[in-house]
Design a protein with these regions (language model features):
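Bacterial N-terminal signal peptides that target proteins for export
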Residues: 2-12
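Terminal domain-start segments
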Residues: 25-74
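Mid-length scaffold segments of soluble, non-membrane domains
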Residues: 73-112
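Short aromatic loop motif centered on NTY/YTY
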Residues: 110-164
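Bacterial N-terminal signal peptides
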Residues: 12-21
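Surface-exposed loop/turn elements that mediate protein-protein interactions on large endomembrane-trafficking
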Residues: 46-61, 98-110, 160-174
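Cysteine-rich, disulfide-bonded extracellular modules and peptides in secreted proteins
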Residues: 35, 102, 106-115, 151-156, ...
Length: 179
């Protein structure tokens, strides 16, 4: 192989490595940018009569009374969803669900959190995932998720971003928080 061809190969190699590292760096820095609520507009606010609770899921059949009562509330998320919840036993356990006021359908995702005593700083920590701030004018839903670390010595905090489409929540991004 001639020296000129080798030089060209080396130049291409450095160019490729430099380009791929820039792409990698862009993905890493861009990955922590949270989605914005204004990028996920909701349909117009539903102002009609609440639908009858749809009993097409085990969740709806199990919590029929609580979910039916929730349909009388004003929507708080994505133009037509009401947020409701209930205690689920000991340790400050709490479940949250969203119900579509227009269709009466329950989103099948249950958000669940409970209190956990942290012996390191003698405080109660909420562990699990819960809805942080539903927005009536956006289909973007933000949740906080707290888990025990793999070594069990501290907690790991995340912010999860979901969008609702056709009565289904889809996780679109998870960002690990530094707490």
């Amino acid at each position: 192989m001639s020296k000129n061809i080798m030089k060209i190969h080396v130049i291409y190699l450095f160019f490729f490595l430099g380009l791929s590292s820039q792409i990698s760096f862009a993905n890493e820095t861009g990955s922590q940018v949270p989605p914005r609520t204004e990028d996920y507009p909701a349909p117009p606010l539903y102002k009609g009569k609440p639908a009858k609770l749809s009993l097409d899921s085990e969740l709806a059949r199990t919590f029929r009374t609580r979910l039916t009562a929730a349909l009388s509330q004003k929507p708080v998320y994505a133009g037509e969803y009401v947020l409701t919840g209930w205690g689920c036993g000991s340790s400050g356990c709490y479940d949250q669900v969203l119900v579509n006021k227009r269709t009466g359908k329950v989103l099948d995702m249950v958000f669940n959190a409970y209190s956990s005593y942290d012996v390191n700083d003698e405080s109660d920590i909420r562990v699990g995932e819960w809805i942080e701030s539903p927005q009536i004018d956006s289909s973007l839903l933000t949740t906080v998720k707290v888990e025990n670390s793999q070594d069990g010595k501290h907690f790991v905090y995340y912010t999860n971003y979901y969008i609702v489409d056709k009565n289904q929540l889809t996780l679109i991004k998870t960002v690990q928080d530094s707490k």
